[in-house]
Each structure stands twice: as C-alpha cells, then as structure tokens.
C-alpha cells in the first residue's frame, strides 16, 4: 500500500471513529478496504488490531521490560478492565519476585493480587491478537530468584574438548605446538585433564582429576592432581584424594570479595565478566545504567567486562581487583581435607595427610590447620577479626618439624595482616608482616632426600594500596614487598600502575623495581596511550607507547587496529629499540565453529610467520557432536531442531542441526532465553526461558520446544451467509482462545500447522485449504 492511499484510509477511519455513534450502536463498515494489501503485513495488523479483551483463560507469552521470560496461563475477569490483577504465585512461577513494599498500596485485598499497572512507573498490557502479556516494571520493583530456588544441574553425559594448535616459522626452522584441555561427564562425575605437545617432545598430561560436586556437604570430592586450599599454609599441588568446601555452591556462604561492576548499556545487552580467560559471570541487562555485585570466584588480578549490544558491537572495561581479609559470616565455614603425595607415586614413606577448617563467629573468624607425614608435621591456628570502621586484622602462627637424612629442624612462623576498605569506591589498603624462625620449614620446600638451607625465608613485609577516583576516571595501584632470608640475602620489589580515561582515550603509566641476591637493581618505566578514531566511516584504534628498561634502554612502539566485522580484525605494529627494529601484521577471525589467527613480522635479523587455530569440540547425549569457537567451563547446548542459521541466542548463528553453544556461570542462575525477533515469523515458542544452575564443568542439552505456525487474515461467513459477529472468540482444537473476530468478520489468526480445525463459536472451519498468507484476506465459510 503506497503512502498516499495509506493516509487517505487513515483519514476515513478517523472520521468514522469520531462519529457520535458508538461501536455497539453501529458496526464499523470496512467493506471499502480492498482484499489485497500488497506485501506490507504491518498494514493488516494496523487496521485489524483490537484492544478488546473478553473474560476468559488465555495461554500467553509473558514479556518483562520487552524481554520474553516465559509462557503462562492468564485468567482475565470482568474486574480487570482498569488494570490486570496479578497474584504473587503467578509472578513467582515466571521467576519474578516483586518488592511487596513497592506495590503495597496496589494490593487488592479482596482478590489477593497486585494491580501493578496502577503504579505510575509500571505498565501491564495484553495484546489479544498476538497473545502477548507485557509487564514494564522499574528495577527497584522486583528481583530475580536466587539459585536456591532451582535444583542443581549436573548436566548430561558428554564431553567438552578445548584445543589450540600453533605453527611458527622463521628463517632457520619451524615449530609446532598443540594444547588440549577438556572433560568427560558421566552421571555426576567429571573426568578432567589437559595436555600439550611440542614438535619433538612426547605428549605430556597434567592436572588429571576425577571429581564430583556433593550438595549435602557443599563441597567437592576430587581424586587426582589437585592442590591444597588452606588459609594458614602455603598451598601446594599434590596427587591424592581431597574433600573441600566450595563457597560458590550456596549464596549465604559466598564469602569471596565481589566488587561492584558498573556500566551503561545502549540496548538490551549481555554483560560478560572474565578473569584469565574464564567466564565468571554473564547476564542480560536492560538499556541504561547497570550494577553487578554478585560475581563470584574472583581472585586478585584483573577483570575484563565486555558489554555486547543487540547490534553485536562490544565495549570492554578492565577492572583491577585485590582481595580483602577473609571474614566469614557467623555460622559459616570452610574446610579442606586430603591425603596424597607431592609426587605421582604412592610410596608409603612419602604420603601425607592434612586438614584445614575456618569457622565464622560474631566479628571473628577462627582458622586451624594440621599436616603430617612420616618425616614432617605442621600445625597452625589463626584468627581474622573486624575492628569496625578501622578495617580488619588477621593474625596466625604455625609450628613445623622437619626431619631429613642429616638432621631434624623445628621452628615457628607468625604473621599479621591489616586491611581496610577506604571510601565507597572499592579502594583498598593491605599491610602484611611475616616472621619465620631459622628452623621453620614450609612443606612446599621440604624434601627428605635433599635438605635446603640456602633459601629459608626469615621476614617478609608487604604493602598494597589501590585507589579509585571515579570523578576523574583514575585508578592507582601501588604494591611493594621485601623478603629477608636466613643466609643474609634479601629480595625487594615494587609495582606502580596509574590509569586514566579522557573520554574515549585511555592513558596509563606503569613502573616496576626489583633487586635480589646481590644482583644489580632492575627497573622499568612505561607509558602507553590508546586512542580510538574514525576515518571514512570506519572505526580504528591506535596504540602507542614508550618504555625504559635498565638493561635494554629506551624502546618505542606504535600501532593501530580495526574491527572490520564483528568476526574479523587486524593489527599493525612497529617497534624500535637500541638493539632492534621490527614491524608486524596480525589478523584474527572468529566463526561459529572455530577461531583462528595469523601473523607475520620482520626485524633486523629474521622474518617470522605464525598461524593458530582453536576452538572446542562438544558432544552430548541425544545432541550429537558440534564444533564451536566458544570456550567455557560450563556450557549449554541450546537446540531448536530444524532451525539452522538463526542467531536465536548468544548472538551466534545455529549450526546445521539448529544448535548453539551457550556459556554458563557455575552455581548461578543462567537464564537460557530465546530472541524471538531472530526467528522466522511462523515460529511460536512453547517454552522460552529455562533457568539452569550448573555444577562445575556441566554440559547441558537444552532443547527448545516450538510450534510451526501458519498466519492468515480471514473473513468468515456463517452457515446462513452472514459474517461472524465482532467479538466472537476463535479457539484451536485444544479449546484455547487464539484470537477474536474483528469488525466485518475479519480475523487475524496464528494457527499451529498440526491443527486441522479452528472453531468460531458453534461452527468450525478446516485449515487444510487455507493459504499461509498475511497479504491477502481469504473468505471462508464456517460449517
């Protein structure tokens, strides 16, 4: 329909609607509208959309702030003309826990439900043609369910194998390197391992473990190559059996430090938080500012937050993190028990056993540990206490007895740490001191066959300060330490980092200093600046810097990069120092099945080239084997069988079997949500949102049920040749209301292709002869 005709029809309709005769007195005559509307389906919906909602039971898709969250039965009564009244249980079943104080004045005592739409910032609407019920609620009005509401998912039997292969070549030789890491899941058990191979070496494996999460103990049973996790002794890796608590398993015991991560989303976006390449958290946020304060599993280091918008564009923010003292809430505890050997043998003389337990009291956390073997023993006690606004203090003491082939050493070690959160911006100060007597021996350094005297630590001082200035977009971090050894040697080190953003420009200064064992001091100072810019409607990023090192002198580097597409980018870089000059080009490409990169560089002495390919191979029972470029600790295979090439979730197109790999955060709610706007118009979801709480390294096959629909615009006549009256309910073969008759017998229908008949009141029509067409009104007779 062209614009001129469209405007004329709108004017005619306005004239008819504004007449004094109401719809009940005189039915609107639409005979002047031609039966053929061209190809614009919006014209049909514009003319025939009706806001009339009759009392009854409806099966509806429910949207919360424009995101489909599920499908539910909606009961509409005569009292719902002004505002829909929603029961607490109905909302809870959809994963919404409303703030009762927020909606307290809108609670209908007689009907025992909330008239949410009467609150000025909330809206409830029901489109009876599309069968969509929409809720618009501010963030302060509701919360999402915690993972205690959902059962753990150990996943399905399957495997997840991550691989990387690397080839490099220069003027003289070439080398090949391969790396594998993965797990095989059977029932509730996970067999995990990783291995690598250099060109001429044998394939080497390490970190091979068999583990199981035990919910009743809120911990993990681990068999194989693992590591101790105690608060009073230096942690060591060992081969054996271990049972240890896992704070990630229950919200009330998650004592890990979690910074507040803030940002602004331009659209409905996915926020992903990673550390060291591992996905710690991923969730969808609405447009506007967001705050995330429940990221778990963080360690000291740097977080990378990526905001992926609906159009596929991304923005990254790097967030430095340092731990504060570990205080447990009253009644909470951590434990770690194990038996094994520091080497991959089970010789009785070398087997050790250990235990560690932390327990939270009011304002105090107590720590205790014990380790013993035939030639070594260690015991420790400690406490972490809050001193209110002044911060937190921890003190501990250990004693050891170490017997080697020559003599027996006995000694003690004491430590004290102070930490304080300064201000509301996550600023942190940590001061630490540790003293060890000459006879004290850490088990990590103990060897019965080869006693060591030269590197026994005597004293250690540490200080860390991190400071944020949000108004100036400044982050400052200073760390310093000094160690003294009993052989009169010492080691000193310090790091300084200063970062500031000037709009989209990022500048940083980094410095380090070290000196130890009589060697000359070494220091480094560097300055780096990143500037994004546009040229010919293309987005580029420049990066340049200068460094000074005592040994190598001054060095310069400059480069730029471009994201040509969301899957492909390249980087050009040049560098110069007193000993060398070089230039390099690198490219990166990521598909739904793999990721690959290639680079070439040239310096004074040689030319180098390299290539890399990586990804994951995932197999799951009843879901087959698939290739993906995504790497994740826990993963869901989301499948809409028969729908290949559609990016219905995670922004990645489905493979030939309609599958997409979806990263999940361990022991947290993961809402597997389908983007219906990415699907063909004839697809209607039976279930949209599935919440999964995966265990560590779980592989879950999630099949999404859907109906293949046909869409029609019908003008229906009864047995006597009259059009079906306006307001007549249209039902499918299951008796569910799917639409209503509009003016002049016109109905807009979405019909399951498996439905053979549709009912208009007391008469019925066969669907076999209907055309799947929204651009033409079909006239049919009702039987």
From Swiss-Prot:
GO cellular component, as recorded: cell outer membrane
Signal peptide: 1-23
InterPro entries assigned to the protein according to its UniProt record, in alphabetical order: Fimb_usher (IPR000015), Fimbrial_membr_usher_CS (IPR018030), FimD_plug_dom (IPR042186), PapC_N (IPR025885), PapC_N_sf (IPR037224)
Disulfide topology: 763-782
BP GO annotations: pilus assembly
Pfam families given in the database record: PapC_N, Usher
PROSITE patterns: FIMBRIAL_USHER
Membrane topology type: Multi-pass membrane protein
GO molecular function: fimbrial usher porin activity
Coiled-coil annotated spans: none
Intracellular or extracellular location(s): Cell outer membrane
Family annotation (Gene3D superfamilies): 2.60.40.3110, 3.10.20.410, Outer membrane usher protein FimD, plug domain (2.60.40.2610)
Keywords associated with the record: Cell outer membrane, Disulfide bond, Fimbrium biogenesis, Membrane, Plasmid, Signal, Transmembrane, Transmembrane beta strand, Transport
Function: Involved in the export and assembly of K99 fimbrial subunits across the outer membrane.
Family as reported in the entry's similarity comment: Belongs to the fimbrial export usher family.
NCBIfam families, alphabetized: PRK15213.1 (NF011760)
Name under which the protein is recorded: Outer membrane usher protein FanD
């Amino acid at each position: 329909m062209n614009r001129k005709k469209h405007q004329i029809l709108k004017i005619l309709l306005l004239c008819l609607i504004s007449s004094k005769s109401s719809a009940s007195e005189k039915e609107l005559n639409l005979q002047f509208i031609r039966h053929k509307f061209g190809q614009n389906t919006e014209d049909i919906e514009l003319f025939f959309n009706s806001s009339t909602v009759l009392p009854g039971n409806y099966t509806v898709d429910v949207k919360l702030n424009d995101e489909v969250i599920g499908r539910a039965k909606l009961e509409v009564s005569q009292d719902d003309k002004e505002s829909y009244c929603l029961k607490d249980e109905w909302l809870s079943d959809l994963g919404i826990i409303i703030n009762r104080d927020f909606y307290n004045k809108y609670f209908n005592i007689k009907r025992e439900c909330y008239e949410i739409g009467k609150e000025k910032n909330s809206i409830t609407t029901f489109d009876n043609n599309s069968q969509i019920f929409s809720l618009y609620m501010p963030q302060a009005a509701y919360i999402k369910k915690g993972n205690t509401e959902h059962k753990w998912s150990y996943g399905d039997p399957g495997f997840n194998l991550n691989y990387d292969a690397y080839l490099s070549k220069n003027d003289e030789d070439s080398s090949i390197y391969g790396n594998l890491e993965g797990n095989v899941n059977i029932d509730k058990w996970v067999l995990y391992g990783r291995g690598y191979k250099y060109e001429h070496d044998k394939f080497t494996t390490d970190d091979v473990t068999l583990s199981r999460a035990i919910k009743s103990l809120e911990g993990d049973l681990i068999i194989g190559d693992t590591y101790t996790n105690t608060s009073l002794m230096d942690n060591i890796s060992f081969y054996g059996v271990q049972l240890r608590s896992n704070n990630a398993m229950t919200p009330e015991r998650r004592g890990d430090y979690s910074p507040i991560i803030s940002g602004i989303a331009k659209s409905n976006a996915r926020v992903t938080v990673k550390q060291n390449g591992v996905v710690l958290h991923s969730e969808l946020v609405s447009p506007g500012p967001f705050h995330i304060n429940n990221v778990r599993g963080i360690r000291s280091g740097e977080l990378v937050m990526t905001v992926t918008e609906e159009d596929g564009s991304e923005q990254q923010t790097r967030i430095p993190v340092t731990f504060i003292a570990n205080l447990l809430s009253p009644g909470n505890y951590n434990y770690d028990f194990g038996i094994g050997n520091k080497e991959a043998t089970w010789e009785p003389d070398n087997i050790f056993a250990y235990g560690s337990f932390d327990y939270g009291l009011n304002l105090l956390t107590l720590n205790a540990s014990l380790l013993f073997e035939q030639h070594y023993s260690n015991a420790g006690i400690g406490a972490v206490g809050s001193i209110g606004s002044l911060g937190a203090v921890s003190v501990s003491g250990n004693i050891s007895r170490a017997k080697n082939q020559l003599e027996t050493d006995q000694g003690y070690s004491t430590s004290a740490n102070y930490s304080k959160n300064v201000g509301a911006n996550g600023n942190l100060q940590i001061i630490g001191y540790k003293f060890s007597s000459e006879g004290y021996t850490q088990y990590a350094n103990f060897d019965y066959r080869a006693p060591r005297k030269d590197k026994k630590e005597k004293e250690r001082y540490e200080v860390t300060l991190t400071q944020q200035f949000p108004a100036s977009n400044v982050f400052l971090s200073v760390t310093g330490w000094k160690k003294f050894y009993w052989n009169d040697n010492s080691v000193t080190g310090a790091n300084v980092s200063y970062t500031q953003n000037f709009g989209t420009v990022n500048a940083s200064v980094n410095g380090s200093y070290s000196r130890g064992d009589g060697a000359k001091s070494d220091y480094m100072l560097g300055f780096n600046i990143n500037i994004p810019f546009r040229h010919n409607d293309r987005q580029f990023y420049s990066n340049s810097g200068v460094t000074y090192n005592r040994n190598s002198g001054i060095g310069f580097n400059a480069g730029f990069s471009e994201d040509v597409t969301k899957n492909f980018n390249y980087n050009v870089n040049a560098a110069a120092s007193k000993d060398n000059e070089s230039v390099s080009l690198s490219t990166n490409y990521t598909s739904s099945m793999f990721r690959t990169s290639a680079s070439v560089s040239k310096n004074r002495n040689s030319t180098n080239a390299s290539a890399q390919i990586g990804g994951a191979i995932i197999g799951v029972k009843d879901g087959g084997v698939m290739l993906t470029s995504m790497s994740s600790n826990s993963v869901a295979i989301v499948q809409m069988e028969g729908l290949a090439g559609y990016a219905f979730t995670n922004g990645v197109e489905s493979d030939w079997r309609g599958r997409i790999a979806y990263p999940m955060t361990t022991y947290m709610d993961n809402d597997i949500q389908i983007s219906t706007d990415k699907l063909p118009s004839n697809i209607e979801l039976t279930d949209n949102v599935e919440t999964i709480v995966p265990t560590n390294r779980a592989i879950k096959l999630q099949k999404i049920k859907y109906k293949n629909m046909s869409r029609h615009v019908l003008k229906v006549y009864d047995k006597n040749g009259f059009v079906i009256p306006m307001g007549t309910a249209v039902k499918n073969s299951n008796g569910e209301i799917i639409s209503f008759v509009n003016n002049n017998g016109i109905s807009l229908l979405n019909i399951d292709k498996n439905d053979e008949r549709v009912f208009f009141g007391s008469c019925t029509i066969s669907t076999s002869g209907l055309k799947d067409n929204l651009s033409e009104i079909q006239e049919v007779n009702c039987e």
